[in-house]
């Protein structure tokens, strides 16, 4: 299989209260930056042949150096991200298309991952890549542990309670056949439409292509708030013991 990973790592971590424009991807877990763990998983996934990273301008050279020194040979491109996450993914898609136009083989599938999710496992990446080729799109998710309620029309009060059995919490990496993801992003760019994840774009522009669920456990967290850091250290320790 020939799949390319896009890692969106341009976030400044506003909810982490880091200040000074620091990036949550550069916080350390187990002695290594969050983004190091993220890249390592894709480096070790057999399905992934190339990795494109979009990050803040001031971190481009840092990540290139990190990849080189860590032996992350699949990292072929580190570029500046955009204003929004979707813009960063779009920058990587354009880079992939430019490389294909220059003679490099176009990947069969593209997986888009959050740089702040360091605990996805190589075998999970391979499974999502395979499902995305088989079904056109595949997205990891897990079942919510809490009851989910809608916000009501009256400020400060709940509305209806949703049936938890019909809900999933969506994660990344989200995998797609390359042409589906590329066309969805191109159409969204033409319309100036933004979504919170790539699956939402594919749902809109390819409604006849249902997205295959890949159900995961609860280890694949996104580091978003300060409370996530001790949890991340615990997950890292647990996963390290299993290796």
From Swiss-Prot:
Keywords: Isoprene biosynthesis, Nucleotidyltransferase, Transferase. Gene3D superfamilies: Spore Coat Polysaccharide Biosynthesis Protein SpsA, Chain A. SUPFAM superfamilies: Nucleotide-diphospho-sugar transferases. Pfam families: IspD (PF01128). It is an enzyme of class 2 (transferase). The record marks 15, 24 as: Transition state stabilizer. It catalyses: 2-C-methyl-D-erythritol 4-phosphate + CTP + H(+) = 4-CDP-2-C-methyl-D-erythritol + diphosphate. CDD domains: CDP-ME_synthetase. One of its GO terms (molecular function) is 2-C-methyl-D-erythritol 4-phosphate cytidylyltransferase activity. InterPro entries: IspD, IspD/TarI, IspD/TarI_cytidylyltransf_bact, ISPD_synthase_CS, Nucleotide-diphossugar_trans. Pathway: Isoprenoid biosynthesis; isopentenyl diphosphate biosynthesis via DXP pathway; isopentenyl diphosphate from 1-deoxy-D-xylulose 5-phosphate: step 2/6. GO terms for biological process: isopentenyl diphosphate biosynthetic process, methylerythritol 4-phosphate pathway. Catalyzes the formation of 4-diphosphocytidyl-2-C-methyl-D-erythritol from CTP and 2-C-methyl-D-erythritol 4-phosphate (MEP). This is 2-C-methyl-D-erythritol 4-phosphate cytidylyltransferase.
């Amino acid at each position: 299989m020939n799949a390319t990973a896009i890692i969106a790592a341009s976030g400044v971590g506003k909810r982490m209260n880091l200040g000074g424009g620091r990036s949550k991807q550069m916080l350390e877990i187990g002695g290594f930056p969050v983004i190091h763990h993220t890249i390592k998983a894709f480096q070790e996934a057999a399905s992934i042949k190339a990795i494109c990273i979009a990050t803040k301008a001031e971190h481009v050279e840092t990540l290139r150096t990190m990849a080189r020194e860590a032996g992350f040979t699949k990292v072929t491109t580190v570029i500046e991200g955009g204003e929004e996450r979707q813009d960063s993914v779009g920058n990587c898609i354009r880079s992939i298309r430019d490389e294909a136009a220059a003679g490099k083989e176009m990947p069969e599938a593209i997986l888009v991952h959050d740089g702040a999710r360091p605990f996805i496992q190589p075998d999970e990446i391979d499974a999502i890549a395979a499902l995305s080729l088989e079904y056109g799109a595949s997205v990891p998710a897990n079942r919510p542990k809490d009851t989910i309620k809608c916000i009501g029309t009256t400020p400060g009060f709940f509305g209806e309670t949703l049936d938890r059995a019909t809900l999933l919490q969506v994660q990344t990496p989200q995998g797609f056949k390359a042409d589906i993801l590329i066309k969805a992003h191109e159409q969204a760019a033409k319309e100036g439409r933004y979504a919170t994840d790539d699956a939402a774009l594919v749902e809109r522009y390819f409604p006849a292509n249902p997205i295959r669920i890949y159900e995961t456990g609860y280890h694949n967290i996104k580091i978003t708030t300060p409370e996530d850091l001790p949890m991340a250290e615990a997950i890292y320790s647990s996963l390290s013991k299993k290796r």
